[in-house]
């Protein structure tokens, strides 16, 4: 049986990892072992931060709505309860956008 050498396979694998680690600093973009470790870490961070981003945006929307509502003497939880009891189904993103871009429409929510 002929001897199988895996030079092409390993070169392709190394090249794939090094291409994925372009833009990393120092040895993390040139040496395979460190590039591989940094690449795995970067993928873990990106997975984690895709979920973190959703929490961050929700927190930002709540903060914006809270600050906008406090101008009118309410707080966030009272305002959200008010919307729920009056069957106004707007999500936090839309409410936060209204409070910034269209204060008159936001005021109409309070007067509904």
From Swiss-Prot:
SUPFAM superfamilies the UniProt entry points to: Ribosomal protein L20
Entry-linked NCBIfam families: rplT_bact (TIGR01032)
Protein's UniProt name: Large ribosomal subunit protein bL20c
GO molecular function: rRNA binding; structural constituent of ribosome
A biological-process GO annotation: ribosomal large subunit assembly
One cellular component term from this protein's GO annotations in UniProt: ribonucleoprotein complex
Keywords: Chloroplast, Plastid, Ribonucleoprotein, Ribosomal protein, RNA-binding, rRNA-binding
Main location as per UniProt: plastid
Location of the protein in the cell: Plastid, Chloroplast
CDD domains: Ribosomal_L20
Zinc in keyword set: no
Entry-linked Pfam families: Ribosomal_L20
Keyword match Ribosomal protein: yes
Taxonomic source organism: Chlamydomonas reinhardtii
Family in the record: Belongs to the bacterial ribosomal protein bL20 family.
Function summary: Binds directly to 23S ribosomal RNA and is necessary for the in vitro assembly process of the 50S ribosomal subunit. It is not involved in the protein synthesizing functions of that subunit.
Annotated InterPro entries: Ribosomal_bL20 (IPR005813), RIBOSOMAL_L20_CS (IPR049946), Ribosomal_protein_bL20_C (IPR035566)
């Amino acid at each position: 049986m002929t001897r199988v050498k895996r030079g092409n396979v390993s070169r392709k694998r190394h090249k794939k990892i090094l291409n994925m680690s372009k833009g990393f600093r120092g040895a993390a973009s040139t040496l395979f072992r460190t590039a591989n470790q940094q690449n795995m870490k970067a993928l873990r961070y990106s997975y984690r931060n895709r979920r973190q981003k959703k929490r961050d945006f929700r927190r930002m929307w709540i903060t914006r709505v809270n600050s906008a509502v406090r101008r009118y003497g309410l707080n966030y939880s009272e305002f959200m309860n008010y919307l729920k009891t009056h069957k106004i189904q707007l999500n936090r993103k839309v409410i936060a956008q209204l409070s910034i871009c269209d204060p008159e429409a936001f005021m109409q929510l309070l007067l509904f």
